[in-house]
Amino acid sequence: MSIMLAMPLAYLGAALVGALIPVNAGWREPDHGITIYLADNGVHVDLILPASAHGLDWRPLLPKSDFDQVPADAGWVAFGAGERRVYLETPTWGDITPRTLWAATTGGERVMHVEWTRDPTYAARAIRLTPEQYRRLWAAIRAGFALDLNGQPVRIDHPGYGPRDAFYEGVGKASAIDTCNQWIASRLRLAGVKASLWSPFVQGLTWRYRKADHST
């Protein structure tokens, strides 16, 4: 078997094993608390949190003035993190180039993607958290933003994918090991939620959580 074939197979095998091994294995979803959501497009997962809950408010950090056009009743914020070139240079999958594929594989600066939304229930999965778990998740997401001297996230001069989203400077590097989806899994782990040990792909992350209720 050539090394060109062996390496992708080894990566896929490791991803499968990592998806089956839990961290925070003793976690159980509480009967009451704050519900958050996981939305995915088959390749990438976003975390969706309420704009304000239990005294934690995203609006001072991510003012709607940072965005072109946010509905007044948009009360939820979606967060993702990924490699700079992949995020900024590929608004659609048809825009992927060898350069962005190389960046995704070898790694580069991480940026944050933020989008306001009215309704989070389009998301595929839902997770209920205790107030303490929510506080830890909120802090873990906030720590992903690079901050200016005033403690504010640094907005990137980029039009975004639409009128309700924007990009911000992130912290650390993204790579084929620490992917966008692994970043999400790590936020859940830091909150104390059961998550997969290593989940570079969507399916390895989302399978552990219940489907969102679309009836509400």
Spans of model-derived segments:
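N-terminal membrane-anchoring alpha-helices
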Residues: 1-35
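Activation targets extended, charge/polar-rich intrinsically disordered C-terminal tails
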Residues: 3-16, 143-216
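General secondary-structure edge motif
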Residues: 27, 92, 117, 121, ...
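Glycine-rich catalytic cores of cysteine/serine-nucleophile enzymes that process amide/ester linkages
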Residues: 38-129
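Short, mixed-charge, low-aromatic patches
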Residues: 90-98, 135-145, 160-165
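Second-shell loop/turn segments in exported
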Residues: 120-130, 166-175
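Internal catalytic-core helix/loop-beta-alpha segment
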Residues: 124-150
